[in-house]
C-alpha cells in the first residue's frame, strides 16, 4: 500500500513538472516566433537605410561628373 502511494505521488509530481515545462517552453517558443522575424526586419532595414544614405551622398557629391551633361555640351560645341 505504501509503495502504491509513493508511485502515485511520483506520478503526479512528474505530471505536474511535465505540464509546467511544456507550458514554459510553449510560451518561450511563441515569444521567439514573434520576436525573431522582427529582429531580422530591423537589421535588414538598417542595411537599406545605409544603402539609401550612400545613394544620396553620391547624388549630392559636387565633384561627381554628370556624363549626360558632358555629352550634350560636346554635341553643342560640335554644332
Curated annotation (Swiss-Prot):
Subcellular location: Secreted; Target cell membrane
Name of the molecule in the record: Ponericin-W-like 32.1
Tissue expression notes: Expressed by the venom gland.
Species in which this protein is naturally found: Lychas mucronatus (Chinese swimming scorpion)
Family that this chain belongs to: Belongs to the non-disulfide-bridged peptide (NDBP) superfamily. Medium-length antimicrobial peptide (group 3) family. Ponericin-W subfamily.
GO molecular function, one term: toxin activity
Chief subcellular location: secreted
Recorded GO CC terms: extracellular region; membrane; other organism cell membrane
Protein keywords: Antibiotic, Antimicrobial, Cytolysis, Fungicide, Hemolysis, Membrane, Secreted, Signal, Target cell membrane, Target membrane, Toxin
Amino acid at each position: 500500500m505504501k509503495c502504491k502511494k509513493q508511485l502515485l505521488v511520483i506520478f503526479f509530481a512528474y505530471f505536474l513538472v511535465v505540464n509546467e515545462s511544456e507550458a514554459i517552453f510553449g510560451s518561450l517558443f511563441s515569444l521567439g516566433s514573434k520576436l525573431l522575424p522582427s529582429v531580422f526586419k530591423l537589421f535588414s532595414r538598417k542595411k537599406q537605410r545605409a544603402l539609401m544614405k550612400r545613394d544620396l551622398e553620391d547624388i549630392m557629391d559636387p565633384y561627381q561628373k554628370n556624363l549626360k551633361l558632358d555629352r550634350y555640351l560636346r554635341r553643342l560645341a560640335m554644332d
